[in-house]
């Protein structure tokens, strides 16, 4: 690995994993997936400008620009850990079932008001995204914010072994990826792997004191330095959303109102988490609040969109049982008129799937009779257990719903689109 690290430094810290986006002079890692093998494209990567290719097998006549390793993914991860060890930079690790990407962006926004930061781009939070983020660390960064996702036990432990966080937070724990985790307790154990590392290193956790699950997880780890936050804990008021003020507003105990560009009361926890981190790193409160108020979400996460015909709340990047119910509760609490729901099937819920979809259907039917459901049939199957869903419309795909909307346009509605990226609900705003 020392030789590989020397080559990495020689290339100025540039790495890539996709021949469609080769960075000239970089180290190319020939990763493998279900439907591809990067080893097949290693020679092409060099031809397109990569300086070296890390491979598991070398082509005939290969020169010294090919670096052979037993496992390219492990090599990438080991390289990231070695690189991280060269820096004393504080690292904020963030995980959780819901809200981790928004929280990560808010934490980056407030810390950037004082520091030069490195932050996970988009949702590159998996076994590949985490090492790629860490390999971007350089002497100019004063703090790093690393988002960590997981769908199976041990994946957070793997991420923290590379990132070596000095502090961190778990946004929440909910019922998601149950096929991989096995149960809700499996979710808690896996997310808790971040706490396990920080407990072993006497690190700091920022935790939601309003969450009984989070508090239980924190209490079990006695060496943690604990910094609480939470709307109830802090005496914060979440002001109701309405047609005139559709975005989240938070009234602090001293009377100051934070006016965000986020949709949904559930985002209050994410805002308070970011402010908690900001205080720990001694960011001026006015600067931190200004950063939060300036932040605008993207990537179909809690976005408010006004079209010529309707008002849309687009939260179509990620969905699970917990986040779906939370979004519906928030939508129900608003005074928007003519509400419509477009929901996508939830996946990776295992044996809990039918019950989870029935739970969502019952809550959705109590909000509006105008209900459109998209996906492979999870909602359709659950509707057999929910008589009040008899008027719902089911579509196999977002494309099928888009075609139907072309001849049955909606007008003067407030429409919540909630689903996972795989549901492709993001194609619908153009026709709404």
Segment roles from a protein language model:
Residues 67-71, 391-401:
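Short acidic-hydrophobic, aromatic-tinged amphipathic segments that line or gate anion-handling sites
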Residues 55-63, 169-311, 336-337, 362-370, ...:
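Acidic, Mg2+-coordinating active-site environments of NTP-dependent enzymes
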Residues 1-78, 82, 332-336, 362-366, ...:
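N-terminal leader/targeting and accessory segments in enzymes
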Residues 94, 299-301, 422, 426-427:
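ATP-dependent carboxylate/acyl-activation modules
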Residues 394, 412-430:
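Peripheral docking tails and interdomain loops at the edges
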Residues 26, 45, 79, 94, ...:
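Residue-level signal for inorganic ion chemistry
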Residues 75-209, 213-223, 278, 403, ...:
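Phosphate-binding loop of NTP-binding sites
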Residues 33-36, 297-300, 316-390:
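Active-site beta-alpha connecting loops in nucleotide-dependent enzymes
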